[in-house]
A protein has these predicted regions:
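Rossmann-like AdoMet
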Residues: 1-209, 216-217, 223-225, 229, ...
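Short secondary-structure boundary/capping segments
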Residues: 97-98, 251-253, 286-291
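Rossmann-like AdoMet/SAM-dependent catalytic core
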Residues: 150-153, 160-168, 174-182, 282-394
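General small-molecule cofactor/ligand-binding pocket signal
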Residues: 207-209, 272, 322-325
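Short, conserved secondary-structure transition motifs
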Residues: 214-215, 276-285
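A short, conserved alpha-helix within the catalytic core of class I
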Residues: 214-221, 242-260
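A short SAM/SAH-binding and catalytic strip from SAM-dependent methyltransferases
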Residues: 231-247
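Conserved beta-strand signature within the Rossmann-like core of class I S-adenosyl-L-methionine
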Residues: 233-237, 259-280
Length: 394
């Protein structure tokens, strides 16, 4: 199996993890069910309590940072660019809420982008969430779609014993049926589109782009259809850029930073990222080994083994304000007493020590190109000003 296919397949486990946590009552996301593979019985999707709580903390933290970005100066139109969006349901909740004040772009491998566009076309509840007319450009490439097979987790890496308890059998994610595919019309010529990106869905406020992120390494290459460089913009990378080699990952971020800090742009770019890190300890090394046995490599785990290394990386790339916290810190510092009582009542967490150790190896990172000066590493301003209220570990 190719490395690209292995990385694409990790979205299946992320989806099942989110659905299991939703089904256990940690949050409400009824749209997740629409993305489940047809051969999966929703009633049989279960995860251990420590995984459900970890998924909840990850979803909660990313959502809070995104919501705060959108609510700060809420009368200003903003833009979200989600890298490796996969089966994320977030746009179908945010677009109806913010409508003309939000432009939302999702980038993923072409096959994943195509599958999501097909799913939107199939389900009215998804299509109706998108303001304005929706255009589809779903074509059949030379190679037909193949079922997506569940591989290794995008979220958590259990121990061998925990993996054996969680029922990690194969799961297939079939592309949606009943959608007429057709050749692309009005598509860029090969000379205009040397990297073969495609846009299987577009609307006045929502685009799905099929593109290999490794081709987005220059300011010109990130100028995909519909991206507005004059808008305050948030990059979202949930376990996405970590699959690239560090130099490639840095180049992608640098390309977006340069594009958004040019004289004609907004100079207002932020990032919210979720990635594992090794902590350069035994548990981190076991995580890396377990991933390797499944064909998965996450190069950034060793290249940036600590929260401080990731924050220094963001600042070095041009995010003048940057902060971070591991999921254990976020769990303890961001969840208020009432919410903690609620989630404590959902499931008995016998494995608290294991939970703390596990989530301490996953980090949430946030940063922005605002302010322009380097006077403070935590001086969030403008559309990112609300982030100053979030407790930070680094």
């Amino acid at each position: 199996m190719s490395r690209n296919k292995i990385v694409q397949d990790t979205d299946s486990d992320a989806l099942l993890s989110k659905f299991a946590a939703e089904r256990a009552g940690y949050y409400h996301d009824p749209l997740l069910k629409l993305f489940l593979p047809s051969n999966i019985d929703p009633a049989h999707v279960h995860k251990l309590p420590l995984f459900n709580r970890g998924t909840y903390v990850r979803v909660m933290a990313v959502s809070k940072l995104i919501d705060q970005f959108l609510e700060t100066t809420s009368d200003t139109k903003k833009q979200i660019i989600s890298l490796g969006a996969g089966s994320d349901t977030r746009p179908f909740y945010l677009l109806p809420k913010y409508r003309s004040n939000l432009m939302y772009h999702e980038l993923d491998f072409a096959v994943s982008a195509r599958q999501k566009a097909e799913l939107v076309a199939k389900h009215a509840v998804l299509k109706d969430a998108i303001p304005g007319p929706v255009e589809y450009d779903i074509h059949t490439p030379d190679l037909p779609h193949r079922p997506r097979r569940r591989s290794s987790p995008r979220l958590f890496v259990p121990s061998r014993e925990q993996a054996s308890q969680s029922g990690s059998g194969p799961h297939h994610l079939h592309p949606s049926s009943g959608i007429n595919t057709h050749p692309r019309h009005n598509s860029p010529s090969p000379a205009q589109n040397p990297h073969g990106f495609e846009t299987p869905l577009k609307s006045p406020s929502y685009y799905i782009h099929g593109v290999d992120l490794r081709h987005l390494m220059t300011p010109a290459s990130v100028q995909l259809p519909g991206i507005d460089f004059s808008l305050p913009t948030l990059l979202v990378s949930e376990c996405c850029l970590c699959y690239l080699e560090p130099d490639a990952s840095d180049a992608v971020l640098a390309a977006f930073i340069k594009a958004f800090t040019s004289p004609s742009s907004s100079n207002q770019l932020g990032i919210v990222s979720y990635e594992p890190f090794s902590s350069d300890d035994q548990f981190g090394r076991v995580m890396i080994h377990n991933l390797a046995t499944r064909g998965i490599s996450i190069p950034t785990m060793m290249a940036f083994p600590t929260l401080q290394a990731q924050v220094s990386r963001l600042r070095g790339l041009g995010f003048k304000a940057a902060a971070a916290g591991n999921l254990k810190y976020v769990h303890d510092a961001w969840i208020n007493g009432d919410e903690m009582q609620k989630i404590d009542a959902l499931e008995l967490l016998d494995e608290r020590e294991e939970f703390d150790l596990l989530v301490a190896h996953y980090g949430i990172y946030w940063g922005s190109t605002v302010p322009e000066s380097d006077s403070s590493d935590y001086k969030f301003e403008g559309p990112f000003g609300g982030w100053i209220d979030f407790p930070r570990q680094i």
